[in-house]
Amino acid sequence: ILLSSLATGSIGDAFAELNQFEDAYDYYVKASKSDNNYTTPLFLYKAGTVAMRLSKFKKAEEYFTSIKLDYPKSPEAKNIDAFISKAIASNQ
């Protein structure tokens, strides 16, 4: 499952490099569904940042909040409050 989510997330990375953000978003969301402490917060973070770029601010807030609540010890949680605040502010 770990390798599968990494492969799926890597496809998302490739789409992001090509500025195909809708496709990247879809792959990051798929990759984030793998329930493990390593890849899930990473791909929730990537899904959130791409969601912000696509003006999906409520979804971004959900992804960032999930990192805060479910993966508080992950590297992605370190400054997540700033991302949550930015998503909330952008949605208003």
Question: Which residues does each PLM region occupy?
Answer:
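Short solvent-exposed coil/turn linkers within tandem alpha-helical repeat scaffolds
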Residues: 1-4, 31-40, 68-80
